[in-house]
Amino acid sequence: MENRIYLKNETYEEYLKIKETAEGICEYINGIVCMSPSPSTGHQRISGNLYFELRNYFKGKTCEVFSAPYDIQLINGNEKNLVIPDISVICDKSGFTNNKYIGVPSLIIEILSPSNQSHDLITKLGLYEKYGVKEYWIVSPKNKSIIIYSLDNEGHYDIFENKTIDSEFISSSIFENLKINMKDIFQ
């Protein structure tokens, strides 16, 4: 699968059946099944570097870091969405099950790929804002940059940081003293 595939107007139950046999990443957002190819080598290097830095930061703290593939189910009344972020930081442990997390992570990181840019920049940005993900990082391997969106007091995203590899560090608006060297991410 080289490009993202969308199947519209599917129920959550139909999605679960599709997911059982799907190759790559299979998400369910606003009634649409989104299937993506497995990530590239460069994507995985960046993901691994970020995971390593975050894992070190959260060692001995109450929050946990998870990397894809790990299902995050977002529920609002009868509305269900299931996403598989590249990285998520979960501080509220009450939503863990054996095979997924039901609830809202504090931080989600998505790494852009040619097949998913509009999906991560538009669809997921709106979804994560709607569900109250406190911080959303969008990583661009092509531009070697990271945009950090942070929820304001009214529940809307503002850009907290927009850094390139020429910047020394990227930091978090919600986790005190979390600073990651940009060169360590894109090495």
Where in this protein do the model-derived segments appear?
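Gly/Pro/Ser/Thr-rich low-complexity, intrinsically disordered segments predominantly at protein N-termini
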Residues: 1-187
